Swiss-Prot record:
The chain crosses the membrane at residues 47-63. Keywords: Cell membrane, Cytoplasm, Membrane, Transmembrane, Transmembrane helix. Its main location: membrane. Residues 19-45 are annotated as: Disordered. This is Protein CYSTEINE-RICH TRANSMEMBRANE MODULE 11. It comes from Arabidopsis thaliana. It is found in: Cell membrane; Cytoplasm. Mostly expressed in stems, siliques, leaves and flowers and, to a lower extent, in roots. Belongs to the CYSTM1 family. The lineage of its organism: Eukaryota, Viridiplantae, Streptophyta, Embryophyta, Tracheophyta. It comes from the Eukaryota.
Length: 76
């Protein structure tokens, strides 16, 4: 009996109280509930007037520098 696998004796035979049965109509809980759905993605950001204006000005300045400079030949 000094062997570690026999550290606890077997329980005595007999009836053991198991508690009341579960209520009728309630399914047993075998699996954990599913995780909540992820939050929706944020709405797309709208470009404001000032940002669009600055982009247009930069584009115009770039085109002016590249295409209106007589030292740069774009077409033959």
């Amino acid at each position: 009996m000094s062997d570690p696998k026999y550290a606890y004796p077997y329980p005595a035979p007999g009836n053991y109280p198991q508690g009341p049965p579960p209520p009728v109509g309630v399914p047993p809980q075998y699996y954990p509930p599913p995780p909540p759905p992820p939050p929706p993605p944020p709405p797309p950001r709208k470009v404001g007037f000032l940002e669009g204006l600055l982009a247009a000005l930069c584009c115009c300045c770039l085109v002016d520098e590249c295409c209106c400079d007589p030292t740069i030949i774009c077409f033959d």
